[in-house]
Regions:
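Nucleotide-activated sugar donor-binding and catalytic core shared by glycosyltransferases
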Residues: 1-381
Length: 381
């Protein structure tokens, strides 16, 4: 069968690539065409547009690039119609993907599957109407979404397990590199504890968050701070910021290896918070925004949830500290990081991580999703 996938950022590229691999196992004749990235391209098929040309986040970046975004949407719709896939699989990225789903429902007979559903439980809950109307099947990766979609909105979904949990478990099972070897390979001091910096996957996130993280690094000489480079972001972009902190090192393509040896982490909100928890690395969640006081106020008034990090959302309580908008300050980050380097607060966070891991379960998400997708497609023929 023919599968058209759309992923608009680095995390979507990762999860979609694993789904593609599982789909090939379930359907050896699978053909792929996609908006995505290098990891999806490695699975075969045709890369139509790289996510680097799609990944705009926040009101002002989206407004500035609106013409490009609309042009990409039009191109995507035309390409799908011309290729005529058996199914279109949307991977997160709701601003773009829900528009594609609306078009496909209105103009074609192509079924739409959503893998990694829009987080409408956080905000824009009204989008449930669009999802109910335009999405044929929804495959959830967060256990609490079952209650939200099925319990609150009476919209049946499939919880397939969490792909991040599957990926981390697989990596930890097979990874054997010693700390000394990792440090030697990356020019790090083997005897100095590592604090990992995960500053986001988009340029705007990095620009907003990394400078303050580096200020904190300059104040903690007993630790070595190591920045995990995101896929699709070139070294020169990071080095513009790192010039202010000569003690910080950059590693690329080794985020899981870095987390395997990290003592603690500063993490920009997103999938990375969950990855860090599953590696049992105590963390502070940091997220800077435009107009922080305004955003801090609106967050309390607009968001439908108490937390922004997946760790706290899955646990349904505060396991990790979230420094967002008006609470994102150098002083707060330094204090909260110091608090989890040793002692009871650190141990309490690690206990919370175990609760999160149990809630996610041990299903292999891409395998489970691929099996269901192929089964559903065959039953509809």
């Amino acid at each position: 069968m023919r599968y058209y996938l759309i992923a608009g950022e680095a995390s979507g590229d990762l999860h979609a690539s694993h789904l593609m691999k599982s789909l090939q196992t379930e359907d050896p004749q699978a053909e792929f065409r996609f908006f995505g990235g290098d990891m999806m391209a490695a699975q075969g098929g045709t890369l139509v547009k790289h996510y680097r040309e799609l990944a705009y986040m926040g009101f002002f970046p989206v407004l500035l690039h609106l013409r490009t975004i609309l042009k990409n949407m039009k191109m995507c719709k035309q390409d799908i119609v011309q290729w005529q896939p058996d199914v279109v699989i949307l991977v997160d990225y709701p601003g773009f993907n829900l528009d594609i789903a609306k078009f496909l429902k209105a103009q074609t007979q192509i079924p739409v599957y959503y893998y990694i559903s829009p987080k409408i439980w956080a905000w824009k809950e009204y989008r449930i109407k669009n999802i109910r109307r335009d999405v044929s099947e929804l495959f959830s990766i967060l256990p609490f979404e079952v209650d939200f979609f099925e319990g609150k909105h009476h919209y049946p979904i499939h919880y397939v397990g969490n792909p991040t949990a599957s990926e981390v478990a697989e990596f930890r099972k097979n990874y054997s590199e010693s700390r000394a070897d990792f440090c030697r390979k990356n020019g790090l001091a083997s005897g100095k504890p590592i604090v990992a910096l995960l500053a986001g996957s988009r340029r705007q996130e990095i620009k907003d968050n990394l400078p303050v993280m580096l200020q904190v690094a300059n104040e903690m000489s007993d630790y070595q701070f190591v920045l995990a480079g995101a896929p699709g972001i070139d070294d020169d972009y990071y080095k513009k910021f790192m010039a202010a902190s000569s003690i910080t090192r950059l590693v690329k393509g080794q985020t899981y290896e870095l987390l395997s040896h990290a003592h603690a982490a500063l993490v920009t909100s997103g999938t990375a918070t969950l990855e860090t928890a599953l590696f049992r690395v105590p963390q502070v969640v940091c997220y800077e925004t435009f107009f922080p006081r305004v955003v801090g106020y609106l967050r309390k008034k607009v968001l439908s949830v108490k937390y922004i990090s997946l760790v706290n959302l899955v646990a349904d309580k505060e396991v990790v500290t979230e420094l967002v908008a008006d609470s994102f300050t150098f002083t707060n980050i330094l204090y909260e990081l110091s608090r989890i380097l040793e002692g009871p607060d650190r141990e309490q966070m690690l206990v919370g991580y175990e609760e999160v891991a149990r809630a996610l379960g041990n299903k292999c998400a891409p395998d489970e999703a691929a099996h269901l997708m192929v089964k559903l497609l065959h039953s509809s023929i």
